[in-house]
Amino acid sequence: MAAAEGPVGDGELWQTWLPNHVVFLRLREGLKNQSPTEAEKPASSSLPSSPPPQLLTRNVVFGLGGELFLWDGEDSSFLVVRLRGPSGGGEEPALSQYQRLLCINPPLFEIYQVLLSPTQHHVALIGIKGLMVLELPKRWGKNSEFEGGKSTVNCSTTPVAERFFTSSTSLTLKHAAWYPSEILDPHVVLLTSDNVIRIYSLREPQTPTNVIILSEAEEESLVLNKGRAYTASLGETAVAFDFGPLAAVPKTLFGQNGKDEVVAYPLYILYENGETFLTYISLLHSPGNIGKLLGPLPMHPAAEDNYGYDACAVLCLPCVPNILVIATESGMLYHCVVLEGEEEDDHTSEKSWDSRIDLIPSLYVFECVELELALKLASGEDDPFDSDFSCPVKLHRDPKCPSRYHCTHEAGVHSVGLTWIHKLHKFLGSDEEDKDSLQELSTEQKCFVEHILCTKPLPCRQPAPIRGFWIVPDILGPTMICITSTYECLIWPLLSTVHPASPPLLCTREDVEVAESPLRVLAETPDSFEKHIRSILQRSVANPAFLKASEKDIAPPPEECLQLLSRATQVFREQYILKQDLAKEEIQRRVKLLCDQKKKQLEDLSYCREERKSLREMAERLADKYEEAKEKQEDIMNRMKKLLHSFHSELPVLSDSERDMKKELQLIPDQLRHLGNAIKQVTMKKDYQQQKMEKVLSLPKPTIILSAYQRKCIQSILKEEGEHIREMVKQINDIRNHVNF
């Protein structure tokens, strides 16, 4: 489902040399030098309200533009490894080349998480006792490296809420995130142990711009559950939050008048008892709009335990409608669809007078998934560590595939793919009004869970939580990068889409030389045999990659190795061999049916060939008969024409055409006589004209003889008259131009 299989391409060469890079050797040496010192620290040095530092699920790795950033806690710096070569590909560079980003003002607390801002210009350094923001330096040069490719670069850091954490020693930071807007100034959202959410701007990092007090939800927000006061008195606090995609909400939700809508981000807040609250935040206009706290959101179908009392993480997948993933420390995942509330809800009837009641959505628990935090060994069912092990779970979005997310915890890494999102969209687009039928929809096709990495293979071993997790989404290829507790780099190529956890079938392999069969196109139905085989081969449990625990110098006893071997053998037997045998039986049964169908179709084909041969012979005989009949018909037509001609010629009376011809022949002599008279008249006129012309031509022509003096006088007079006429024309043109002006 998550890991891709196949040969390594040209763009994936970096996956082979990255684990051998010198930065991991440097981090491992720093870990060796740091371990004896940490062992001598007293147990009282760690905060009682926080888990032990070595058991924290850290994430001190992130990527940006083909570069991998690793946090070095010993030097308080980032080690930047360039995954792309000078030409922009993934070719192997020098394994000793990297850049160091030093903090000018290093943090005084331990960093367990780093977050890249939406604008990709700042990095949040998150610890239990504070938060600091590092500003990434400028890039320039041929390869667009930091400050032209210097080996060491100083970076400015900005402490956020430093005075607040310094003055309140008992408070801890439980969750932190960036405000998801890319067009506004960077804002950091903090959830502290006093059950308050504070929003800080980097322009004023010591004073919160907005504060959301969660402990006073009963007095300042719309409460749908009367028993919420008793729950708050028991000390239930928020443990995590997550932003959803932009949504348009009315101004009345922010306490403003008007019917217009405001674009805001929904903020889903998860409490430890499993309840979820909702508020809307818009920082577009200073100082920002914070909506009233709505909730707890009703969950359907209802459960007595409210779907667990150990909730630890929430994730909002970027789709419409929103899908919330709620994780518990026991390894349960709840996929909840956020839909509009129903009118017949009992809670809404109590507060029907409030206009904001329509804005409270409901959470429809589409499905529940249980993660295998610790491996269920074949002979370890009675081991208490196997059933009682629990740990916080962190949820990570997949930037390449919106319908997939990843889970990290102390015992390893899981990937979860939701293949029913498109069916959910089709269901919501239909005219169905019964939203409870979502449960029936969830039984058709469940999500796929893949156990990628196991860092706690044995119940008696201490877990070795990973230190970094990142998904490379760019042109280098979707890849999962995990940094173990000993700074080993593990890489798994990912698929771009969610696929079932079953091996690929032969019929799904692409072959450009073989044309697609039209029958295969017709066979692409929801109940096709290919999908049936996929459902049989679908695996619910897999053998993850094992990682040595923190006690790496102590070899496990043979009994524990036998347990792991037995577990792996059982998984291979049940999830691979047994299902392949079932698929083999189905394929053999299908082959037998297809052979019978082929035999019957061959018989039908031979019968059709015989019929075609007989039809062709019959068509040839009919064609010959047609030609003979056509020739006979032409002969008969010619004989009929001759017969009619002879018949008409021997008739005793004239026909109509013959009568007309007779009349025309009788009129011809009269017409000839008239034409002869007309010719005589024309001839006489011609002779008369010739006589007249001869008389005119015979008359003598008068001649005028001028002397030289007369010709000269006439020429001079004509010349003077011409000049006079020219002057008059010129005067007339001048007068005309003057008048027109």
From Swiss-Prot:
GO BP annotations of the record are: mRNA export from nucleus; nucleocytoplasmic transport; protein import into nucleus; ribosomal large subunit export from nucleus; ribosomal small subunit export from nucleus
Annotated GO MF terms: structural constituent of nuclear pore
Q: Per its UniProt record, which disorder involves this protein?
A: Fetal akinesia deformation sequence 4: A clinically and genetically heterogeneous group of disorders with congenital malformations related to impaired fetal movement. Clinical features include fetal akinesia, intrauterine growth retardation, polyhydramnios, arthrogryposis, pulmonary hypoplasia, craniofacial abnormalities, and cryptorchidism. FADS4 inheritance is autosomal recessive.
Q: State where the protein is found.
A: Nucleus, Nuclear pore complex
Which residues get modified to N-acetylalanine? A2
The primary location reported for this protein is nucleus
| Subunit organization | Interacts with NUP214/CAN. Interacts with NUP62 and NUP98.
Q: Which gene encodes it?
A: NUP88
Q: What job does the chain carry out?
A: Component of nuclear pore complex.
What is the name attached to this protein's record?
Nuclear pore complex protein Nup88
Cross-referenced PANTHER family: NUCLEAR PORE COMPLEX PROTEIN NUP88, NUCLEOPORIN NUP84-RELATED
Q: Modified residue Phosphoserine is at which positions?
A: S35, S50, S379, S437, S442, S517, S540, S698
Q: Which residues carry this modification: Phosphothreonine?
A: T525
Alphabetical list of InterPro entries matching this protein: Nucleoporin_Nup88, NUP88/NUP82
